């Protein structure tokens, strides 16, 4: 297969981190745009990105791009794409997409047109008047932005933030991709004492352990393209072997504490599923009263936030108490994510640096001290 262009969508604010990550994986011609990062390569590069990308949401092949001001433009543009290079005669090819600031604004209508064009193209190429779609799934995705269409083939299936270790979560969970981003912002590589004092279901600590080990986050899950006839099985075997060869071994100090015992039980289960249960210590403790576990280290955390007024006031009091507790913890660097716009006021200190991110649709800032 010739060199292809791939697109990795990501949460807003993580584009630069994802770009750096893909470059570290030796992927070629990495290009960063708003909420997505592109690279070029073959199926081996695709498998490596799926297995090893910590902060992207999925890996998609860019099949085509063209302008469309009418449904006929959209139909002809999709019909011209050589879908038969990837989709066999029995392949199932559902369609999902979105449209913004375009003349073709009805997403259901656009999805129907893309589907019709794909059916027409494949029917003609395979000499079939009806396509059974009883085989493996080849998810088509499209975006229409300012009348410019991009057509993609999703190779990941389930979003990459689903690593396969978290089946249960407490309230206000942090996406695994966002947790990995916070650990990367803290520049944690396994040498410092790492502490999440509001660990909840353990996501930040687990992602820290995976990063310390240099363990590929996708080793415990499967991907849509693994079942495709056009992708040799050896591609996936080689990618997994290389990922395992890159792992580190060492002694790490990772602590997750929380005031809620039920959350800690879930955290321990999740850590075991992720294969890092022995690397993380979980402790029941109040973050505003607990003694510092070491003289220096990294604090990376997602304190509780409230959506209703009473919950917001409770969260604000918690930020104040937490700030007072850490007032003299000068040996600790702190990376705290919060959706509270006045977080610095309640915490009692201006951040050295701030970075705007989105946890799903929730606008947040990472406050760095």
What is each of the regions a protein language model found here?
Residues 100-103, 159, 304-308:
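A short, flexible beta-alpha/helix-coil linker loop
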Residues 140-156, 367:
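C-terminal edge-of-domain segments
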Residues 151-187:
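SAM-dependent Rossmann-like transferase core, predominantly class I methyltransferases
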Residues 174-291, 307-308, 314:
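Conserved S-adenosyl-L-methionine
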């Amino acid at each position: 297969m010739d060199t292809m262009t791939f697109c990795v969508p990501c949460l807003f604010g993580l584009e630069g981190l994802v770009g750096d990550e893909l470059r570290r994986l030796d992927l070629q011609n990495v290009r960063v745009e708003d909420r997505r990062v592109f690279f070029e390569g073959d199926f081996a590069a695709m498998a490596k990105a799926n297995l090893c990308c910590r902060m992207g949401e999925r890996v998609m092949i860019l099949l085509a791009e063209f302008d469309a001001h009418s449904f006929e433009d959209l139909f002809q543009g999709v019909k011209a794409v050589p879908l038969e290079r990837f989709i066999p005669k029995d392949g199932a090819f559902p369609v999902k997409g979105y449209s913004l600031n375009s003349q073709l604004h009805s997403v259901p209508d656009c999805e129907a047109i893309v589907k019709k064009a794909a059916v027409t193209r494949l029917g003609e190429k395979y000499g079939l008047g009806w396509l059974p779609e009883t085989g493996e799934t080849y998810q088509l995705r499209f975006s229409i932005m300012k009348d410019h269409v991009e057509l993609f083939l999703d190779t990941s299936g389930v979003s990459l933030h689903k690593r396969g270790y978290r089946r249960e979560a407490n309230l206000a969970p942090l996406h695994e991709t966002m947790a990995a981003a916070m650990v990367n912002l803290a520049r944690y590589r396994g040498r410092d004492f790492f502490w999440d004092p509001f660990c909840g279901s353990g996501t930040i600590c687990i992602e820290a352990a995976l990063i310390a080990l240099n363990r590929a986050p996708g080793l415990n899950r499967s991907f849509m393209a693994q079942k495709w006839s056009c992708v040799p099985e050896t591609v996936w075997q080689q990618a997994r072997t290389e990922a395992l060869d890159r792992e580190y071994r060492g002694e790490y100090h990772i602590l997750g504490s929380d005031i809620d015992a039920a959350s800690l039980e879930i955290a321990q289960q999740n850590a075991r599923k992720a294969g890092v249960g022995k690397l993380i210590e979980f402790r029941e403790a109040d973050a505003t009263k607990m003694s510092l576990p070491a003289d220096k280290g990294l604090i990376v955390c997602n304190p509780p936030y409230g959506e209703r007024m009473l919950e917001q006031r409770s969260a604000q009091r918690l930020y104040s108490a937490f700030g007072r507790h850490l007032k003299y913890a000068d040996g600790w660097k702190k990376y705290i994510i919060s959706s509270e716009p006045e977080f610095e006021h309640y915490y009692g200190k201006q951040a050295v640096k701030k970075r705007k991110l989105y946890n799903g649709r929730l606008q947040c800032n990472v406050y760095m001290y």
